Amino acid sequence: MRLLAAAMIAGCWAAPAAASPFSGEAALVSDYRYRGVSLSDGNPALQAALNFEHPSGFHANLWTSTLRRIGSIGHSEIDVTAGYEREIAKGLSFDLSATRYFYPSSGSENYSEGTATLTLEQGAASASLGLSYAPPQRALCDGLGRRRDNGYIFGQGGIALPRIPVTITASAGYERGAFDEVRNGGKWDWSLGGEFERGPAKLALTYVGSTADSGSDALVGTVTLSW
């Protein structure tokens, strides 16, 4: 009994447990849009992610989504990302990461991409500017079998509204290379939306568009649960 009492007292005075470096989320989207282009043919998709963040700035992410079968890439996508983020000034951070895109049904479509992002956070507002680059590799061949590279520059921002749990978001990007629309001199994409968050649940409604020849603009709804 004394041992039990001592354990109870020690428990009362113990320091709070440290926050876990792991987090996760699951989502249902009405249309899986990547850089403005639908990869689910306008149909709903299921998505999930597992995240790791270390106080040193190192982070890793495992993300997956269902797809509509496009060519030989199959019905699923798995992305593995690792990176490092560092604050370089008050409210200003720099992130460097690398992502490997896997399509389990076709290993020949797998490819790698690096991304550098600069983010500024001031009060309820945040803004980011980034560049993603995929070097020439087998999955990025053109119709003549030549390996090509791909570049994507993007900006995005958000502002939380006062007194209500709503955030307004916007983004724009320009892509040139293996995934662009050459006849248009590159591909532009953009989005404007809002997010409502309450506890672990988040609802989002976003208007997404692009200059891609395939597809059209769409209003995309998302329901996300985080833990």
Predicted features, each with a name:
Residues 166-206:
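Outer membrane beta-barrel transmembrane domains
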Residues 19-68:
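Short glycine/proline- and aromatic-enriched beta-strand/turn motifs that initiate or cap beta-hairpins
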Residues 111-179:
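Detector for outer-membrane/organellar transmembrane beta-barrel domains
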